[in-house]
């Protein structure tokens, strides 16, 4: 998920926090003097990406779970370090940092880091191509044309293009989404588990977000495929549902 998407999810989560929860969040972030982003809750939603790209590539695998499109297996795609083997991924790390955040014994510094990761990973897990792989690095190896000279890869299309086509202002987008969420939707999403969220994103990736096998198997630098007619408007209607849910997934809803 790109900057705008993460900030929209965080802004939506802020809408649903109780005053007491907001006070606690602000108190945690007030102890954090990291300069990679601005210090507020919404800006901190992108901290994990800045940290990864400024000398911490070992955290890269934490942002996704590569479940094979044709044979999804969450257990083999991701294992928490304590289980041995495999590698940590977005589901195991989200659960880990949620535990760190809620543990009374956690240090002040570790609690701030955990909060920043939780903000970020809740968003990443709801970007469909962070939950599935089609032998194309989650769509990163599939180039697509957006019309004219505009090209991108399929992963970036879902990270950023769909978001900015709908509303480039993250806070305004969050306000719009907040107005559309019913109490029934909120309660259902809040009751979900991390594993359920991941499988929901996987299902969306499999049935909606991927390009055909023929295009997937084309060389990475081949001429970009054109988006099918109507794809962008259809995705623009679909994607907001996957921002509403992570924004509502905080226990403070």
Predicted regions: what they are:
Residues 1-121, 128-244, 248-253:
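N-terminal, motif-rich segments that launch catalysis or mediate targeting to/interaction with membranes
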């Amino acid at each position: 998920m790109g900057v705008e998407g993460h900030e929209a999810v965080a802004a939506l989560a802020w809408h649903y926090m109780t005053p007491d929860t907001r006070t606690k969040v602000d108190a945690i972030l007030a102890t954090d003097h990291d300069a990679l982003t601005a210090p507020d809750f919404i800006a901190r939603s992108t901290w994990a990406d800045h940290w990864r790209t400024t000398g911490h590539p070992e955290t890269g695998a934490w942002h996704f779970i590569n479940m094979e499109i044709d044979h999804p297996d969450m257990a083999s795609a991701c294992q928490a370090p304590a289980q041995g083997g495999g590698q940590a991924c977005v589901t195991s790390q989200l659960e880990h940092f949620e535990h760190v955040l809620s543990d009374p014994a956690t240090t002040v510094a570790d609690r701030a880091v955990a909060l920043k990761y939780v903000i970020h990973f809740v968003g990443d897990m709801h970007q469909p191509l962070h939950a599935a792989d089609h032998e194309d690095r989650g769509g990163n190896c599939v180039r697509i044309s957006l019309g004219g000279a505009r090209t991108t890869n399929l992963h970036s299309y879902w990270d950023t293009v769909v978001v900015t086509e709908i509303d480039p202002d993250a806070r305004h987008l969050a306000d719009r989404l907040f107005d559309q969420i019913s109490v029934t939707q909120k309660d259902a999403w809040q009751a979900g588990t991390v594993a359920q969220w991941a499988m929901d994103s996987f299902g969306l990736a499999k049935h909606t977000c991927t390009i055909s096998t023929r295009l997937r198997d084309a060389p990475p630098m081949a001429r970009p495929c054109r988006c099918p007619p109507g794809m962008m408007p259809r995705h623009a209607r679909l994607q907001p549902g996957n921002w509403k849910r992570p924004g509502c997934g905080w226990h403070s809803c």
